[in-house]
Structure formats: structure tokens, C-alpha cells
């Protein structure tokens, strides 16, 4: 049988197109919304801790407060834009009034505080909450992960602050209520709200 070059390549091209049209079996399965939330929480916490660590090394607690004021909202906004979720931080005793909790966040964090005050091992993962509710509007999905006070956090959130830090906090956050904490206590939470789906 004498086939032209284009006729011989047609079955090969057809086979390639067929392979491209198939779903990617054996690849990474798509993450669920709660798995994506956990990954985002890891990223938010990791990036913010890295920024705060650099600020503490370069300029101490006053520089760290400045980083929290400027960089934390920028990181959250970038993650919100890339994920489609509303990414942020909240606390019952907040430093920035823009981070004040809504009713659900407050209730979840009160539960976190009770959980953290029980005799859990120090190495346990921070408590988290996965909330999915259905209404006439559709399905609402929320994720919260506790931010637990660590010894390094005491410089900015402990009972005793350096005078220059106290001055900076009063200047930048006149309504601050985020001091007087001890290690192991609930400091706040990372919070994600995904778009309502039908």
C-alpha cells in the first residue's frame, strides 16, 4: 500500500487529539473548597510570619507593628484576588477595627478559646472550623483557623509593652484591645468566605 506522508500522519494526529480531549486521569485531583482553604491559611500564615520575622530582626516590635498594618492587608488582598475567597484575619480582641468579627466568626472563636483552654498538648494543630450553610441565597462556605499566641507574639500582644511600641500602637491603632495575652491563648483567626453558590 502506497500512502502519502500526510495520509500516514493523519492517524497519529487523530490519536494525539483524542488523548488531549481525555480528562487527566491519574493526575492531581481537584482540591475541595476546605482543602483550598487550608492551603490558603498555610500560605497566609507563612507569608505573614516571614514578613514579621524580618521586621523583628531589622527594626524590632515597632517595625513588626508597621508590617502588620501595611503588609497583612496586602497579602490578604492578593490571596483574595487569586483564590476568589474573601481572605482575612479577625479577633475578638482586635487591634484594627476593620478586622472586627461578624457573629459567626465571634461564635467560632469563642469555641476555639474554650478548646485552647482545655488540656490540649502544645504541639496540637490549631483548631479550625469548616462551616457550610444553605439558604434561599445558595450555599455559603466559611473556613476559620485559630491564631494561637506564641512566645514571640508577646512583644506586641503581651501584658507589658516597651514604651516606644505602646506609643506606636496608640498612634496607629487608637482602639487597640489586642494586648494582655499569654502563650497558648487564642489571639484571633484567619477567616475565609467563599462566594455563595447556587
Predicted regions mapped to residue ranges:
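The canonical Cys-X-X-Cys-His
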Residues: 150-160
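Basic/polar N-terminal segments that are highly enriched at the extreme N-terminus
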Residues: 2-5, 24-31
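Bacterial N-terminal signal peptides
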Residues: 11-23
Amino acid at each position: 500500500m502506497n500512502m502519502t506522508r500526510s495520509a500516514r500522519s493523519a492517524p497519529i494526529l487523530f490519536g494525539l487529539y483524542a488523548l488531549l480531549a481525555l480528562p487527566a486521569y491519574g493526575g492531581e485531583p481537584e482540591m475541595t473548597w476546605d482543602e483550598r482553604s487550608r492551603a490558603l491559611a498555610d500560605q497566609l500564615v507563612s507569608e505573614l510570619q516571614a514578613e514579621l520575622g524580618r521586621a523583628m530582626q531589622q527594626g524590632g516590635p515597632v517595625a513588626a507593628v508597621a508590617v502588620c498594618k501595611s503588609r497583612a492587608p496586602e497579602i490578604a488582598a492578593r490571596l483574595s484576588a487569586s483564590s476568589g475567597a474573601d481572605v482575612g484575619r479577625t479577633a475578638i480582641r482586635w487591634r484594627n477595627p476593620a478586622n472586627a468579627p461578624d457573629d459567626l466568626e465571634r461564635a467560632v472563636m469563642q469555641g476555639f478559646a474554650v478548646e485552647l483552654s482545655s488540656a490540649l498538648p502544645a504541639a496540637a494543630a490549631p483548631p479550625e472550623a469548616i462551616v457550610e450553610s444553605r439558604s434561599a441565597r445558595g450555599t455559603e462556605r466559611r473556613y476559620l483557623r485559630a491564631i494561637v499566641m506564641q512566645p514571640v507574639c508577646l512583644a506586641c500582644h503581651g501584658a507589658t509593652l516597651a514604651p516606644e511600641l505602646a506609643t506606636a500602637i496608640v498612634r496607629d491603632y487608637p482602639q487597640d484591645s489586642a494586648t494582655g495575652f499569654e502563650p497558648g491563648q487564642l489571639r484571633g483567626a484567619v477567616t475565609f468566605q467563599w462566594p455563595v453558590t447556587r
